[in-house]
Amino acid sequence: METQTVQQELESLPTTKMAQTNPMPGSVGPWKITIYDQENFQGKRMEFTSSCPNVSERNFDNVRSLKVECGAWVGYEHTSFCGQQFVLERGEYPRWDAWSGSNAYHIERLMSFRPICSANHKESKITIFEKENFIGRQWEICDDYPSLQAMGWPNNEVGSMKIQCGAWVCYQYPGYRGYQYILECDHHGGDYKHWREWGSHAQTSQIQSIRRIQQ
């Protein structure tokens, strides 16, 4: 298949109804991602520097490999930033299991994506709470934890969270496995009162590992 290279400038990309997920209008942030319609960086490709709510609008039926050249991104299983989430940090992803292999679920679709504007690995802080609405035991975290329970958290669930700065990815299971939840200080005012606010795919309050997202 003939390779087609298409470069899009920030102002030429489609706007999204979720305005808070985009960089400030007129700014060009440190974000760049290249997607391919075939595995191993083959086939048609396209570069983005801002959000894409639907790759099919760019004549892609799916994203089968990608390269993150600048910044941190989050990919979604479905269009309009819905479904399972996949954190995409700088590097190469030759096929779907490179971004969802640790997810423990077989998901080959990636239909939308956006930059994580608040990612700041050096200055990140989150407070987790035992119950919903910031009630119960609380724990302030500024580092990565492959197992919350091993570090003293009393159970395998988190009721609510406050993101003071940075962006975090929380995982359903220890060792950064299971469903991924991307939580950012510039979404919901940094306050996630209930596990249903973690994402459209959230089905449980189970969180057992957590780490900072690297910009």
Swiss-Prot record:
List every stretch annotated Disordered: 1-24
**Residue list for modification S-methylcysteine:** 82, 117
For the region Connecting peptide, give the residue spans: 118-123
Provide the record's note on post-translational modification. Answer: Specific cleavages in the N-terminal arm occur during lens maturation and give rise to several truncated forms. Isoform A1 contains a N-acetylalanine at position 2.
> Which keywords does the record carry?
Acetylation, Eye lens protein, Glutathionylation, Methylation, Repeat
Gene Ontology biological process: lens development in camera-type eye; visual perception
Q: What does this protein do?
A: Crystallins are the dominant structural components of the vertebrate eye lens.
What is the name listed in the Swiss-Prot or TrEMBL entry for this protein?
A: Beta-crystallin A3
Which species is listed as the source? Answer: Bos taurus
**Lineage, highest ranks first:** Eukaryota, Metazoa, Chordata, Craniata, Vertebrata
Q: Which gene encodes it?
A: CRYBA1
